Amino acid sequence: MSEQTLNYLQEKVAHANQQGQVIRITGSGTKDWFGNKLQGEALSTKEYSGILSYQPDELVITVKSGTSLKEVEEALAEKNQQFAFEPPHYGEGATIGGMVASGLAGPGRVSAGGLRDFVLGVKIMNGQGQIMNFGGTVMKNVAGYDVSRLLPSSMGTLALLLDVSLKVLPKAAATATVSVAMEQSKAIHLMNLLASQPWPLNASAWVGENAGTLYLRLSGAKAAVQSATSAFAKTYGMQTMDADEATVFWKSIREQTHSWFISSDQTALWRLALPSTTAALDLGGETLIEWHGGQRWHRGSLDPKAIKALAQSLGGHASVFRAKEKSEQMLSSLKDHPLTAALVVIEERLRKSFDPKGVFATGRLI
């Protein structure tokens, strides 16, 4: 079946290349709302699925792009392993291809790294229907640029991802979540202070409801986690959450099902990537902070040019994440940053080397 599906995909891409058509790669559609508006004829990878190989001792798994993310995570859990960057699903049926194409990561990214850091190798189909392989199945030094790292966050605009090899990590021996009521500026300072010290700090979140609450997830050796929880309770008055409640909480942050995300879904949700030590921002709306201050979510009616200019002046960038009505002005682009203007030319040359006729030029990524 997979060989037939591969042939079908190859025929569709080759035909689109000949006819000058645009193809929009899709899996289960759980992230159709992400990025720019949908354009092009949908080409599903759902039938191209399956785990090709899994070597727990080598900490590597190779899967086809249409494979269910849930299926892969369950296979990893059986061996007490995980994707440490905690990819969000955003709905039932999320696929590995969508995970890679979106490049999104959950609370654990701040300590483990992003998805791109875990990609070892890929098999792709370019805009002419040719199959290409990059990278491998082990971490090693490579000569030149590791092309496989280009696929994460490319939103399907560079090539059709077929197979991907990913590094996995063992689950921690112990995990605990502590929390304390704290206003935003103090929370930002404390997150960065603790992150600079040898504590087993795995994730953090500040939820701006009422006076605000700071949540810290500790993960590592049992003795280290116990030492940290005791120290934080004594020094900062932090309380340890029930383990099941903590699991539900962090999943709600990862999947954006927490009440903060759904209570004001009539207004646009902005995502600001900033230096973690950036001071608290008064943007006139609601704020939720992750990644020790490096990722800030904001609900409110903001002027796109103003919020993007503010983020840039602080050394970061801003883009709308969810909104009922999106415009290109609301999305982050290389063109917004004068210092990276030269990269626009390089990016265009790179795209054309993989996709000369723009088969995958859907405009999802601007």
Where are these regions (language model features)?
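N-terminal glycine-rich flavin-associated loop
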Residues: 1-23, 45-92, 104-137, 172-180
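A short linear hydrophobic-aromatic micro-motif
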Residues: 22, 84, 200-205, 285-288, ...
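Residue-level signal for inorganic ion chemistry
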Residues: 27, 216, 298
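Short glycine-biased active-site loop of nucleotidyltransferases that positions the nucleotide triphosphate
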Residues: 32-37
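Short, conserved charged micro-motifs
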Residues: 70-72, 185-190, 223-230, 277-284, ...
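C-terminal substrate-binding/cap subdomain adjacent to the FAD-binding core in PCMH-type
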Residues: 101, 120-263
